């Protein structure tokens, strides 16, 4: 049996071997060097893809050297792969011998490629980048368009001066006229065409934004809009406003018209006689007697006080019964000073009380607030005026809502943090009171549908009303705050519902 196998091997011997399962880690040259090390005279390595991948044909000088190489290479492990080596069939050996070795073919291909490159003329490549000499090698944006003004006599005169001073520009203009099939300028002067006169006005409007604003809904739909879904509309409004500011032409500042409102005369202007102006025109001087009616001399009037029995029972003596109501009457009118002698003779004269200036009140109020919070001046300086608030669509259909001790703030900028809101709304609590510090809280939404909104909890409705009045419209990080009272579900009074069986005691 072994003799028959050896006989078959002897009959199938050839000079070419087929080597399968070559390691993929080896390159083409390394595979050729490996097989030539075992005595191969020429090697053809097949491609690394397809059904014949990781295979090679090796041709030897004789069948004896091929059989020796087969015995040494068959079942040899290289880089974790076991080689399978066989004698090639006559058809395979004929095709292999017909084709040149791989190394020879690659050299011939390289030589042929170089020959073709030499035959082709070197055409200079046009560099269409912006400024290659300055390092700007990227291409220009094809969507950009120039916005030239319409022709005028001044512009055409300047172009004529440039044509006279730059000969190359003159030649290029002639080339362009020839390319556009325009009439030749080398002839008598033609009649001037009518000039296109553009009315002086602002520049054309800018291109429409990428995200145009959506059409407005009906009033019924706008009333049902949730207060948490206002971020997209506000962002679009902000982008449109910024685009308008960028593309808006420069304008002269309008002169503010002085309002011709008639000043109403005040009581103090009528009481005190103004000093006569030496430079002004002399006129009749009015006396108080000419303006006010003179009090008539009447008899002494009696003042009666009607006191209830409950009040008289509380008072200790009869002397106090007469003094106490008079004191109450004077306390009810702290802004007036009435003398006892004048009350006996008519109503007397009324003088305005000395009012503390507003600046002093603001200074006293700011002194009570710690320096770590915003001052009243900074609030007024950063708050929008009423006219500016009416122009913004963020405040369209704005309503403060029912007063509660919790504020709802929207249109908050992305870069605003809780410490910024604490810096503003911390002035409306008493830092020394632990109870108010615990009741003061800030919830700022930075993600989801409620992004750009915040809730401020204050100790009382009074402080919340004051905070809403002073902070609504305050510009924080380039966006005005829209402050409202937060919606709260108030419990219904049980006495108002007749189905629940009346009031509980």
Curated annotation (Swiss-Prot):
Effect of loss of the gene: Larval lethal with complete lethality by 10 days post-fertilization. Development of multiple organs is affected. Head, eye, lens, pancreas and liver are smaller than normal, and the swim bladder fails to inflate. The intestinal epithelium also remains thin and unfolded. U12-type introns are retained in mRNAs, whereas excision of U2-type introns is not affected. Assembly of both U12- and U11-containing snRNP complexes may be abnormal. Gene expression levels are broadly impacted; effects are not limited to U12-type intron-containing genes.
Residue ranges, compositional bias (Acidic residues): 221-235, 361-370
Gene Ontology CC, one term: U12-type spliceosomal complex
Primary location class: nucleus
GO molecular function: pre-mRNA intronic binding; U12 snRNA binding
Compositional bias per record (Pro residues), positions renumbered to this chain: 193-214
Bias type Basic and acidic residues, positions: 491-505
Region called Disordered, residue ranges: 96-123, 193-236, 354-374, 486-505
SUPFAM superfamilies on file: RNA-binding domain, RBD
UniProt keyword annotations, A-Z: mRNA processing, mRNA splicing, Nucleus, Repeat, RNA-binding, Spliceosome
Domain RRM: 15-90, 405-488
One example of a Gene Ontology biological process annotation: liver development
InterPro entries given in the database record: Nucleotide-bd_a/b_plait_sf (IPR012677), RBD_domain_sf (IPR035979), RBM40_RRM1 (IPR034147), RBM41/RNPC3 (IPR045164), RRM_dom (IPR000504)
Subcellular locations according to the entry: Nucleus
Subunit record text: Component of the U11/U12 snRNPs that are part of the U12-type spliceosome.
Protein purpose: Participates in pre-mRNA U12-dependent splicing, performed by the minor spliceosome which removes U12-type introns. U12-type introns comprise less than 1% of all non-coding sequences.
Protein name: RNA-binding region-containing protein 3
Organism of this sequence: Danio rerio
